[in-house]
């Protein structure tokens, strides 16, 4: 994996295309989507049931209780794959959580792609739109 310096920590990067392999090797993994509720409802959400991992949907946008919400939901023993639309908000979230003792990886191409890599949805990884 590539490493990206952000503040004083090094957050590992993972592409959406490598997630299935990563989960096979690290079954104690969860996915955390930090986009907004509006994005989840219009663009869709990753559906990780068939990948055998849990997903959590906790927005980072203007939410002062973000870290507390994560602490209530996600165990620090789990590997946390952090996702947003294109990797920008998720690197911030991954860094915040790493500073709290979480083992985080940033999904660098996010749900929708980043111009360089296609992203979760465009790779045909399972997703749903709640209606």
Where are these regions (language model features)?
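Short, Lys/Arg-enriched N-terminal segments with co-localized hydrophobic residues
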Residues: 1-9
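Conserved active-site aspartate in kinases
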Residues: 33
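Short, surface-exposed ligand- or partner-binding patches at beta-edge/loop junctions that are enriched
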Residues: 82-83
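Rhodanese-like catalytic fold shared by cysteine-dependent sulfurtransferases
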Residues: 10-29, 37-79, 90-131
């Amino acid at each position: 994996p590539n490493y990206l310096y952000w503040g004083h920590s090094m957050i590992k990067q993972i592409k959406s295309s490598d997630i299935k392999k990563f989960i096979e090797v690290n079954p104690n993994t969860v996915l955390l989507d930090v986009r907004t509720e509006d994005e989840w409802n219009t663009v869709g959400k990753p559906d990780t049931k068939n990948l055998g991992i849990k997903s959590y949907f906790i927005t980072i946008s203007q939410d002062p209780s973000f870290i507390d919400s994560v602490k209530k939901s996600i165990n620090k023993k789990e590997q946390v794959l952090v996702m947003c639309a294109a990797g920008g908000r998720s690197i911030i979230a991954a860094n915040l959580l790493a500073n709290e003792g979480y083992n985080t990886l940033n999904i660098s191409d996010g749900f929708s792609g980043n111009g360089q890599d296609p992203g979760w949805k465009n790779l045909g990884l399972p997703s749903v739109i709640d209606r």
